[in-house]
């Protein structure tokens, strides 16, 4: 078998619809658009959500809420995650990234108090919850907000 002998399987490729090529083609004269009316016209389609002049559903619903453009989102790290580090080591945003605990930095890193800390660490993050700070200090470590 040679490259020029290859053919696609029978019925796997459909011929394109050639419209406006005589009445015997089945798609002549009106080209499959029906008779008169908006959809028979050139560019005659309505926009998304248009309901024929009736008040659209999305406009009958009340407007609610807004997006705060100044919102800061922090990558979250829990106390459980910090048990990966060796006793007495320093935990920074960079070391958290290296160990895969933080995927993307966003506006910084926040330490939350979920779980139990079993090692003594020096933690340097952007934000800390009160419970997390208490737990780190109870384990003999220190917390520094950068």
From Swiss-Prot:
Name its species: Lactobacillus acidophilus (strain ATCC 700396 / NCK56 / N2 / NCFM)
Q: Does the keyword Chaperone apply?
A: no
InterPro entries per the UniProt record, alphabetical = Ribosomal_uL15, Ribosomal_uL15/eL18, Ribosomal_uL15/eL18_sf, Ribosomal_uL15_bac-type, Ribosomal_uL15_CS
NCBIfam families linked to this entry: rplO_bact
Q: Does the keyword rRNA-binding apply?
A: yes
Q: How does it assemble?
A: Part of the 50S ribosomal subunit.
Tell me the GO BP annotations in alphabetical order.
translation
* Molecular function via GO: rRNA binding; structural constituent of ribosome
Q: Name the residue ranges with Gly residues bias.
A: 23-35
- Stretches for region Disordered: 1-55
Q: Which GO terms describe its cellular component?
A: cytosolic large ribosomal subunit
Keywords, comma-separated and alphabetical? Ribonucleoprotein, Ribosomal protein, RNA-binding, rRNA-binding
Reported function? Binds to the 23S rRNA.
Q: Which family does it belong to?
A: Belongs to the universal ribosomal protein uL15 family.
Q: Please name every pair of cysteines joined by a disulfide bond in this record.
A: none
Name assigned to this protein = Large ribosomal subunit protein uL15
Q: Where is the composition biased (Basic and acidic residues)?
A: 1-13
